């Protein structure tokens, strides 16, 4: 019995947890069971276990501190500590098995796995070179090709387009000006237009180098051969086959015509009309005559909601304005005229309009008929002074005649101008006359 117990004790691993190898601890489902030890302590415990074990007779070098900072030493440590279980596995898999996915390792491509990425910056002079100055398959070479792919290429055939003394920066400016001109030209016509490149020539004049600019017009064949524009830009600029087959001089003339928009002489005919209800306006007690908005605000200060007054507008394009109290404030609204109708917004057909001003004021007396943005004219502010006899006579005369009928009255011209003061003009027609051709 004693011998059997001794033989069983030899077969059973009775070593403490800390002295076991990691392969024995992995049976629990966790890589490092027990206490969480540092890398140095783990390597020491693993090395002790390996020396005790009769299967693995290799010696472990005493360089555990250097193994923490080197990926190759970590791989060697994992191979010695874990035995034949990790043979044939990559470094990433071994680290994942060892750490237990506590620290996820970022996927790296083969391009970046050669070493740590370089922190060196690419100089602008290196980007101007035609060939990559960096070693192939390096990080700097990858960045150099990436930047070159996402920037505008410089065509080797650019000598046909620009002069030989043009610098690289001036060439890029010319390309930007070319695209800007194409956008401006495309606004005037739906047909395609051949693009033009604006180049700068160095001159020895007073303005210094780069002051003169020449517009070189290229044919479609040279555009197709050169790689300055992408295929999409060529398709959008050259959609018409007839346009491509035209001679160069015809294309040049059409470009010059499209660059200068057509000019027209516009003649607008107006009809002048007197205010239709000037007499009723003058008899209305809410009409205060000539008054600016500051005087109106002083009169309306402290008045209840809906109090209003009618006055002459301070702007020449409008005849009358209303000042009213709403939302505890003094507000102002101009009365506009369009097609012999008066409203507070002549360009909106949904806003109420009336053929006379008195009818417009009557409509906005009802609060239920007023929108929140429209004036509320429920309580008129009574005028406290009478008008002059001259003004009253003018309203009576204008009520009996028309604007053209005033010219037939046997009165002085100064009085005719005084009678025509309250009038508006309505647009009748618009005539567009072509501009005469300019002869050089």
Swiss-Prot record:
Q: What does this protein do?
A: SOCS family proteins form part of a classical negative feedback system that regulates cytokine signal transduction. Substrate-recognition component of a SCF-like ECS (Elongin BC-CUL2/5-SOCS-box protein) E3 ubiquitin-protein ligase complex which mediates the ubiquitination and subsequent proteasomal degradation of target proteins. Inhibits EGF signaling by mediating the degradation of the Tyr-phosphorylated EGF receptor/EGFR.
Q: What is this protein called?
A: Suppressor of cytokine signaling 4
Q: Where is this region: Disordered?
A: 1-29
InterPro entries, A to Z: SH2, SH2_dom_sf, SOCS4/SOCS5_dom, SOCS4_SH2, SOCS4_SOCS, SOCS_box, SOCS_box-like_dom_sf
Q: Which UniProt keywords apply?
A: Growth regulation, SH2 domain, Signal transduction inhibitor, Ubl conjugation pathway
Q: Would I find 4Fe-4S among this entry's keywords?
A: no
Q: Which Pfam families match?
A: SH2 (PF00017), SOCS (PF12610), SOCS_box (PF07525)
**SUPFAM superfamilies for the chain:** SH2 domain (SSF55550), SOCS box-like (SSF158235)
Q: What is known of its domains?
A: The SOCS box domain mediates the interaction with the Elongin BC complex, an adapter module in different E3 ubiquitin ligase complexes.
Q: Which residues form the SOCS box domain?
A: 376-425
Q: Name one GO biological process term.
A: protein ubiquitination
Stretches of Polar residues bias are at 1-11
Q: Which organism is it from?
A: Bos taurus (Bovine)
At the top level, the lineage of the source is Eukaryota
SH2 domain location is 286-381
Q: Does the keyword Ribonucleoprotein apply?
A: no
Report the pathway entry: Protein modification; protein ubiquitination
Biased composition (Basic and acidic residues) is annotated at: 12-29
């Amino acid at each position: 019995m004693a011998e059997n117990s001794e033989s069983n004790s030899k077969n059973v691993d009775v070593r403490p947890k800390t002295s076991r190898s990691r392969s024995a601890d992995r049976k629990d489902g966790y890589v490092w069971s027990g206490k969480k030890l540092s890398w140095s302590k783990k390597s020491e415990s693993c090395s002790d276990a390996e020396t005790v074990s009769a299967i693995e007779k290799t010696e472990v070098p005493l360089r555990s501190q250097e193994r923490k900072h080197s990926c190759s030493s970590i791989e060697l440590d994992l191979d010695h500590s874990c035995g034949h279980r990790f043979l044939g596995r990559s470094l990433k898999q071994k680290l994942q098995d060892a750490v237990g996915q506590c620290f996820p390792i970022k996927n790296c491509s083969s391009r970046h796995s050669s070493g740590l990425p370089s922190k060196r910056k690419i100089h602008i002079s290196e980007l101007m070179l035609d060939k990559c100055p960096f070693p192939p398959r390096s990080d700097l070479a990858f960045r150099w090709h990436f930047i070159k792919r996402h920037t505008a290429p410089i065509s080797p055939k650019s000598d046909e387009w620009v002069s030989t003394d043009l610098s690289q920066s001036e060439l890029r400016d010319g390309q930007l000006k070319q695209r800007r001109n194409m956008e401006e030209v495309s606004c005037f016509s739906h047909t395609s237009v051949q693009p033009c490149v604006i180049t700068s020539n160095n001159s020895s004049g007073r303005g210094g180098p780069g002051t003169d600019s020449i517009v070189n017009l290229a044919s479609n064949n040279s555009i197709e051969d050169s790689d300055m524009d992408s295929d999409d830009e060529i398709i959008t600029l050259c959609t018409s086959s007839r346009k491509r087959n035209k001679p160069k001089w015809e294309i040049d003339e059409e470009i010059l015509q499209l660059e200068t928009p057509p000019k027209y002489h516009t003649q607008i005919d107006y009809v002048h009309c007197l205010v239709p209800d000037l007499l009723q306006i003058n008899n209305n007690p809410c009409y205060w005559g000539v008054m600016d908005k500051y005087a109106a605000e002083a009169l309306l200060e402290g008045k209840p909601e809906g109090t209003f007054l009618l006055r002459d507008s301070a702007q020449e394009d409008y005849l009358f304005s209303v000042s009213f109290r709403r939302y505890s404030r003094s507000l102002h609204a101009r009365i506009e005229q369009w097609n012999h109708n008066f409203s507070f917004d002549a360009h909106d057909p949904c806003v109420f309009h009336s053929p006379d001003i008195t009818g417009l004021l009557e409509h906005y007396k009802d609060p239920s008929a007023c929108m929140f943005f429209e004036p509320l004219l429920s309580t008129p502010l009574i005028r406290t002074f009478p008008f002059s006899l001259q003004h009253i006579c003018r309203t009576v005369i204008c009520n009996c005649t028309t604007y053209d009928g005033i010219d037939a009255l046997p009165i002085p011209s100064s009085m005719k101008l005084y009678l025509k003061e309250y009038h508006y003009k309505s647009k009748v027609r618009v005539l567009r006359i072509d501009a005469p051709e300019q002869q050089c």
